[in-house]
């Protein structure tokens, strides 16, 4: 029996090292290794990379992180080239070790108390009107990081009075009451928390998370702030069926969620969960039709859709694929 990895604080554990820490092991079969991307999954990179480098430089200068880079998002080039980014607060090391995610796992450092101020100034310098703030899971903090979210929201609004803020929050496992209480006086303009996939595959896809807990978090925020949209998203292609996806959509509506994102899961490395299937654009369009029929005010469904992909357009109800 091999010895467990002794994690050092502040060290990023990725790929094989990260997967070795997950109780439910990822086993890649020969068939899954041979699964190739269809034509609709090909991305054309922009010719001009000046804006991309500019955003990266601004992040580095202020010691900030983007989920676009840390999670290896396939839309990074497009979003950065349009001058948009999703900021990831509370560091770049997650206390969870989900096998679909490319964000590093480990023992994170203490939150940077200057991060809210640096974040607010960077957003002002970039001239953003809509911003998405997300974070790693911080199970090491007594409030799960909720106060840091609130501090960031306050600082951003002080320097950017006309901005709209969307938060993509973790599940605040075991800390929901405290987190929601903290956010009572400083709520975002859109409250987003992803279910990620269907409950049948949760043990493998989201170890440490609970499907009903996440639904309850969304519902309780909506009950406390009925005029603020709630939003959630799923990745598809991890072994779920279309019928199961539709069932999850129904659960979201029952819990008051009005905005939905569905996108194709892509394997970050050979050490991560393999893609079980590529969902066609026609299937995504069908899912969107079903979502709107259920009463979602907006549904962004497509191969490259992610939670924060053109989030400003999503919030305006403009079609995103």
From Swiss-Prot:
Keyword GTP-binding found: no
EC number: 2.8.1.8
Any one GO cellular component localisation term in the record: cytoplasm
PROSITE patterns listed in its UniProt record: RADICAL_SAM
List of residues binding [4Fe-4S] cluster 1: 68, 73, 79, 308
Name of the encoding gene: lipA
Catalyzed reactions: [[Fe-S] cluster scaffold protein carrying a second [4Fe-4S](2+) cluster] + N(6)-octanoyl-L-lysyl-[protein] + 2 oxidized [2Fe-2S]-[ferredoxin] + 2 S-adenosyl-L-methionine + 4 H(+) = [[Fe-S] cluster scaffold protein] + N(6)-[(R)-dihydrolipoyl]-L-lysyl-[protein] + 4 Fe(3+) + 2 hydrogen sulfide + 2 5'-deoxyadenosine + 2 L-methionine + 2 reduced [2Fe-2S]-[ferredoxin]
Keyword entries, A-Z: 4Fe-4S, Cytoplasm, Iron, Iron-sulfur, Metal-binding, S-adenosyl-L-methionine, Transferase
Disulfide bond positions: none
Domain of life: Bacteria
Name assigned to this protein: Lipoyl synthase
One GO MF term: lipoate synthase activity
Native source organism of the sequence: Proteus mirabilis (strain HI4320)
Family: Belongs to the radical SAM superfamily. Lipoyl synthase family.
Compartmental location: Cytoplasm
